[in-house]
Amino acid sequence: VKPAVTSLSNPAPKTGLYVGNSFTYYNCGLVGYVRGFAKAAGIPWRARQITISSGRLSYHPMAQYLAPHELDPYAKGKVKDGKLTAPMFDVVFIQALSTEPIDAKSIPTWKKYLKSEVAEVKAAGSEPVVVVTWAKKDHPEDTKKLADSIISAANENGAAALPVGLAFAEAHAGRPDINFYAPDKRHPSAAG
């Protein structure tokens, strides 16, 4: 499945929100790695990470994450009369529980919440990016299933899809000497 949205309307986002679970926070969190890469490249980047262990999309109150709070530094200078005048985040990365998009029992609920969360992100003026997760180490055949399911759902909702899982599989295949997985065979190692 090919992504329908292949670029962001803001080609140089400066703020982001990562919404996910342990795939997002494992090994000190994705937010720290991306911040380091951005800093090394001289790219301005600030981000917040909100994760729930074993969290499904339905566990995340997205509208609350994007609502202004008087002490929130991401809302500073963007609130008038209790309402946002500009988005708190340029981009919001939405990452589901890794098996939700391919588990027959989970798919309907996952699609329902992905649709509502993408709509809430857009309503807040941010751009939604749906994260394509990677397969478990002992189930590499799930890589394509995950990518197809997630990209299809992102397309249906007018959201970009970030092919992390496809890149993870390609890197793992290209460097079999590096262990990309933690001992549990699902979370990433520091190299992953």
Language-model segments: which ranges?
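Conserved SGNH/GDSL esterase-like catalytic core that processes O-acyl groups on lipids
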Residues: 15, 24-109
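N-terminal low-complexity, Pro/Thr/Ser-rich intrinsically disordered segments
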Residues: 1-15
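Short, well-ordered coil/turn elements that cap or connect secondary structure elements
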Residues: 11, 40-42, 123, 156
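Alpha-helical cap/lid subdomain in secreted, periplasmic
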Residues: 77-190
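Short hydrophobic segments within beta-strands
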Residues: 19-20, 131
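Conserved catalytic region of serine esterases and O-acyltransferases that act on ester linkages
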Residues: 10-12, 180, 192
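Short, surface-exposed connector motifs at secondary-structure boundaries
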Residues: 14-17, 127-128
